[in-house]
Design a protein with these regions (language model features):
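Glycine-centered flexibility motif
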Residues: 1-3, 60, 70, 111
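N-terminal strand-loop-strand
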Residues: 1-7, 33-34, 38
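Charged phosphate-binding loop/patch that engages nucleotide di/tri-phosphates or the phosphate backbone
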Residues: 97-125
Length: 125
């Protein structure tokens, strides 16, 4: 939203996995190449799902797309957690990422069905 600091994101395109969507959205909105890592949170209702991953910076220089954002900022964790213009959901996701020792990770799973290959995330055993 306007006057809010939000992380890049968007919809999963047909034929795309959430991880592929994350990489595409970061590139489109910021010019940054990232590599998705752990699943850190899911928010959903009957209409939409919001899936959040941690990610590693791979390459690129942060630039605004001048469409979905007016600027690209890097914030340190303490600043992101205390700024009023950072949404509560973003703050909760940062806190989840900081305490991910018991979080979900992608676990190999050999399963393909009618609508494509499954991705399975769970707590490591």
């Amino acid at each position: 939203g306007k006057n809010r600091l939000i992380v890049p994101g968007g919809y999963v395109e047909p034929g795309e996995t959430p991880q592929q969507a994350l990489k595409r959205e970061y590139m489109e909105e910021t010019g940054i190449v990232v590599e998705p890592k752990e699943l850190i949170g899911i928010r959903f209702n009957q209409k939409d799902w919001y899936v959040a991953f941690s990610a590693d910076y791979v390459s690129g220089h942060a630039v605004s797309d001048h469409n979905e954002n007016s600027e690209v900022l890097w914030l340190d964790i303490d600043e992101a957690l205390t700024r009023e213009d950072v949404p509560d959901l973003t703050k909760k996701l940062i806190q989840c990422a900081l305490h991910k020792e018991n979080g979900f990770v992608q676990i190999p799973y050999d399963g393909t069905r009618r609508y494509g290959e499954y991705s399975f995330y769970g707590i490591p055993l």
